[in-house]
Regions:
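Single, function-defining residue in the core of a domain
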Residues: 1-68, 85, 96-99, 106-110, ...
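Alpha-helical residues within the helix-turn-helix
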Residues: 71
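A short, well-structured juxtamembrane/interface segment
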Residues: 113-120
Length: 405
């Protein structure tokens, strides 16, 4: 039985396009990208127009695929507001491969500069900018033939991509996302972070980033780190520090300056390292890998390595707590990115869609003055597809908690 045909995208399904008016001039600088290779001069879909169409896809659930995006481009109001003509499926597919995704970074930087910081814990006011670092896997369903070939070779029908994300805690938004195939070497999450380090940042990471060479790179870049390390880490105590009442109340059970990499000292940290032990609720993490029983039961103690030797122990624990903000963000971001359907399966196309999703996050924050949440994003989508009025959107925003500092 044939699948049910999707309804055509109609003019009344696409509203709220006036909000794209501010964005169009910002993207205009991209207009001539990749035009030099078009010797015949017959390009009809330009980079700025392609990005605006992707943003329309991200904000309008009615536009749910490449084909419906092509249909939307035929609407007179879409063409007027986005400054584009009718886009064929072929031109949309080509655009994902010829335009330079890195050029969207400057757009992201400019929009980020317009954001004001959200609420920050006053206890963290003396800590340099907090950046939570993590990666998430993005499963892209390839075309039927590609999937069949892949299954013959590896027994798998999925292609995995990893989003290496640096998330600015204070403003509640990603400052950088790098897209790589899932794997080691140059695509390893630690290698990607080492290539993109900045000064005056406190990087907050989980156990996947436990690597002494990376710790040294962070310090050499003029930044700091708070990294949860493995439970079985070996160390030699250099200094045992007393636990204050404030630290004990925060769950800190031990605070020591240590020497690491005892078997291979030359491969260890080249700076003073401190371990702060924080008691939490024990849990057991199961592994989904075949033949792997997982990391076993946890003793409920977080072991946090840091080069911040003069910061109170309870603040080290508080800094690590901020890492969970990136986990919450990923739930929202996967929904926003359209993980239900990737518009392109090429790395270039995925990067463009990812950067456009970051721009969408920034727009939600700029339009609403709030941290982008799933509920607010859904309300904006209802407005864009005509299910909610502007008054109802404003009423929703007025009910949100204040974000004043």
């Amino acid at each position: 039985m044939a699948g049910k045909r999707r309804a055509d995208v109609r003019a009344q399904d696409v509203t709220g396009l006036k909000y794209f008016d501010k964005l169009a001039p910002l993207l205009e600088r991209l207009h001539d990208d990749a035009c030099a290779r078009d010797k015949a001069g017959n390009r009809e879909l330009f980079y700025d127009q392609y990005c605006l169409l992707i943003l329309l896809y991200l904000f309008n659930p009615i536009v749910s695929s490449m084909r419906s995006l092509q249909q939307a481009s035929e609407l007179a109001n879409v063409q007027k507001r986005l400054g584009c003509g009718r886009a064929s499926l072929g031109s949309l597919a080509e655009a994902a491969n010829v335009f330079d995704p890195e050029r969207l970074q400057e757009i992201i930087a400019e929009l980020s500069d317009e954001l004001v910081p959200l609420v920050r814990d006053r206890r963290l006011q003396d800590v340099p900018q907090l950046v939570a670092v993590d990666g998430t896997l993005l499963a892209a369903l390839p075309k039927m033939m590609q999937a069949a070939l892949l299954k013959q070779e590896t027994g798998k029908g999925l292609v995995k991509w990893r989003l290496h994300t640096q998330f600015e805690v204070e403003r509640g938004l990603p400052t950088r996302i790098d897209v790589t195939p899932n794997g080691g070497g140059l695509h390893d999450e630690r290698a990607v972070l080492a290539r993109t380090l900045r000064a005056d940042v406190t990087y907050v990471t989980d156990r996947g980033y436990h690597k002494y060479e990376l710790f040294n790179d962070i310090v050499a870049a003029g930044s700091s780190y708070v990294c949860r390390v493995r439970d079985n880490i070996g160390f030699e105590v250099v200094e045992e520090r007393p636990i204050s009442d404030e630290a004990r109340a925060a769950g800190v059970i031990r605070d020591v300056v240590v020497r690491l990499a005892l078997e291979h000292p030359s491969r260890g940290p080249n700076h003073p390292v401190r371990l702060v032990f924080v008691q939490t609720t024990p849990h057991e993490k199961a592994s989904h890998r075949k033949g792997n029983t997982g990391s076993g039961p946890s003793d409920g103690v977080l072991r946090l390595a840091t080069n911040l030797v003069d910061v109170p122990a309870e603040i080290i624990g508080l800094i690590y707590q901020q890492r969970w903000s990136i986990e919450i963000f990923f739930r929202f971001f996967k929904h926003l990115l359209g993980c239900r359907h990737l518009l392109s399966h090429s790395q270039n196309g995925i990067e463009i869609q990812t950067y456009c999703a970051i721009i969408a996050c920034l727009l939600v924050s700029l339009w609403t003055g709030r941290k982008p949440t799933l509920r607010t994003y859904e309300m904006v989508c209802y407005y864009f597809c005509g299910l909610a009025s502007e008054a109802e959107l404003i009423a929703h925003l007025n009910r949100l908690p204040s974000q004043k500092t």
